[in-house]
């Protein structure tokens, strides 16, 4: 693990078994009701366009030139933190006919997407925001329609009611609808300035001066109040079994049971 900047770690895992190199940026932020929706939208809008690639056509053309490189984004819960991830996967340089490093070009592209988004007057572009909001709302409603997923999410919200982990990872439909280009821009600034960041590369080799390029981006930022993703508030022991019934017009019922235990640093105990 390499220290890149304050609250920013770099990790290179050498692996020759695969034909591709994977580069990921992982941002850890506190899981809070008032910021969960904006944060969850960030990885998706950041990997959809940028200043250099302002629309899907320009972005897709660049990915095709990188031999079909693939962009991915996700927003998950990690204990009491929200984990925002952006990744790019590209074939290793030894499989290409180009003289320039394909992996280096892909890493530069992802870095630009994160640090140079398509914004104007301290706000994300309205069309981009509305598109991602629509997709997020469809995702939330889709989880409700998928009863197994809905049952699991309801279990977690009941088990951890009043705690950070009980918050829905993408927020509610109402919270997503309230997002504006300005509020999303503020969330982006907060992510870059206060998130704990882990940059991970898995592949045959590290792109030339990769960590130096990342460090240069963070050097220009005022990093403060860095999220400590190791802190996790312990759940109070349950005095009795809590049973929740929820009636719905479905053909098949779902039974979900949840058990909570303490977190341990010892590998043997965790296993």
PLM regions: where:
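A common structural junction motif
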Residues: 108-120, 216-225
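Active-site SXXK
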Residues: 39-47
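Non-catalytic, conformational "gating/processing" segments within enzyme and secreted inhibitor domains
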Residues: 181-217
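M16 family metallopeptidases and their MPP-like homologs
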Residues: 11, 19-39, 57-112, 148-171, ...
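Short, polar/flexible loop-turn hinges at active-site or ligand-entry regions and domain interfaces
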Residues: 49-52, 94-97, 116-125
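Acidic/histidine-enriched alpha-helical segments
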Residues: 60-61, 116-140, 227-236
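Short, Gly/Pro- and small/polar-rich lid/capping loops
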Residues: 1-7
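His/Glu-based metal-binding/catalytic segments typifying zinc-dependent metallopeptidases
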Residues: 12-38, 189, 196, 215, ...
């Amino acid at each position: 693990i390499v220290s890149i900047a304050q609250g920013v770690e770099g990790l290179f895992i050498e692996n020759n078994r695969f034909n591709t190199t994977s580069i990921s940026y992982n941002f850890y932020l506190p899981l809070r009701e008032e910021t969960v929706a904006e944060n969850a939208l960030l990885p998706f809008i950041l990997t959809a366009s940028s200043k250099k690639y302002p629309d899907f056509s320009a972005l897709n053309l660049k990915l095709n030139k990188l031999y079909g490189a693939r962009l991915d984004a996700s927003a998950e819960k990690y204990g009491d933190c929200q984990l925002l991830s952006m990744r790019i996967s590209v074939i290793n340089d030894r499989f290409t006919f180009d003289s320039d490093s394909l992996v280096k070009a892909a890493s530069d592209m992802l870095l630009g997407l994160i640090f140079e988004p398509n914004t104007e007057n301290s706000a994300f572009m309205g069309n981009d925001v509305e598109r991602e909001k629509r997709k997020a709302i469809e995702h939330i409603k889709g989880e409700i329609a998928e009863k197994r997923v809905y049952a699991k999410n309801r279990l977690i919200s009941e088990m951890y009611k009043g705690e950070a982990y009980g918050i829905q990872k993408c927020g509610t439909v109402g919270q997503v609808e309230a997002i504006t280009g300005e509020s999303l821009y503020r969330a982006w600034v907060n992510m870059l300035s206060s998130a704990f960041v882990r940059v991970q590369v898995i592949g045959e080799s590290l792109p030339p001066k990769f960590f130096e390029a990342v460090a240069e981006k963070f050097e220009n930022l005022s990093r403060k109040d860095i999220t400590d993703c190791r802190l996790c508030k312990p759940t109070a022991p349950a005095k009795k079994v809590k049973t929740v019934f929820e009636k719905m017009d479905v053909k098949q019922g779902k039974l979900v049971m949840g058990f909570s235990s303490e977190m341990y640093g010892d590998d043997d105990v965790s296993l």
